Amino acid sequence: ISLASDKRFSSYFKKFQFISLTNFGTAFGMGLLVMVFMVGQGYFWQPVVGFFGAFCGCVVSTRLMQYFVVKNFPHYAVEDVIGNKQEIAEEEKKVEKSGFIRVLNSLLDGGRTGVDVGLAIIPGVLIISTLVMILTFGPSSTGAYTGAAYEGVALLPRLAEKVNFIFEFLFGFGDPHLIAFPITALGAVGAALGLVPNFISQGWVDGNAIAVFTAIGMCWSGYLSTHTAMLDSLGYRELTPKAILSHTIGGIAAAIVAHLTYMVIMLFIAA
């Protein structure tokens, strides 16, 4: 967002390319955190497979977004983001600032942007993550509610069992509870990562699940919470539905690629 506000940076793009930066940036927004977390759980090459899947999902999402933008606004294919090049020329004529001032400005501007985005995504994070946790996990082992964490009504696993063959075919999920990760990642990938240790302790997770979790966690990165705020800050709020649709498809593609890549690698290892 900070780069997008820079007129000189924006001048390198046509409008349809500039708008798709939202999808491109979201696909890798939490990449380092997701990969480090998975490595910390004892998995090493599986997150790399997930990274490859996220890269493929990013390509799908970004190109789809560009297609939708050009289809609905054909003139965006030829229009520059900065129509008046004189503005850039005037910026270049400004007096050069000292290194200290530039560092200070970058810290202040970056901090303000971070706080703005954080405040914008809090409602989505709280609402989506809370709902998913309530709908994923059941009561305690005694069947009673004790007020402990991860106690809910376990509706999602019951529904997932009905269509588990779809998730098993596309993602290789061996347990219906695992569908909670991608659903939570819609709102906040950090909250989705918090589910993984519990999944591991329950014995539901294997290497394939880690690869798929990494891919879909990186690619989606809580985009339902952030896309609206990002496009609003860029001035294209009306394109939010297109961005969300494109990124939904991109995340699914990332998970499928990660699953297939993992299966191919396992075939070579077995051979």
Describe each model-derived feature in a short phrase.
Residues 51-113:
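Long, contiguous bundles of hydrophobic transmembrane helices that form the permeation core
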Residues 7-16, 88-89, 144-145, 170-177, ...:
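Short juxtamembrane and helix-loop transition motifs at transmembrane-helix boundaries
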Residues 21, 78-90, 149-153, 182, ...:
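Juxtamembrane non-transmembrane "cap" segments at the membrane-aqueous interface
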Residues 39-40, 66-74, 137-142, 263-271:
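Transmembrane helix-loop junctions in multipass membrane proteins, especially transporters and channels
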Residues 1-60, 189-271:
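C-terminal transmembrane helix pair
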Residues 92-189:
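Transmembrane helical segments that form the transport core of multi-pass membrane transport proteins
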Residues 74-97, 122-127, 156-157, 193-196, ...:
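Short, charge-rich amphipathic segments
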Residues 17-18, 25-29, 73-83, 139-141, ...:
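Structured catalytic/translocation cores of nucleotide/phosphate-coupled proteins
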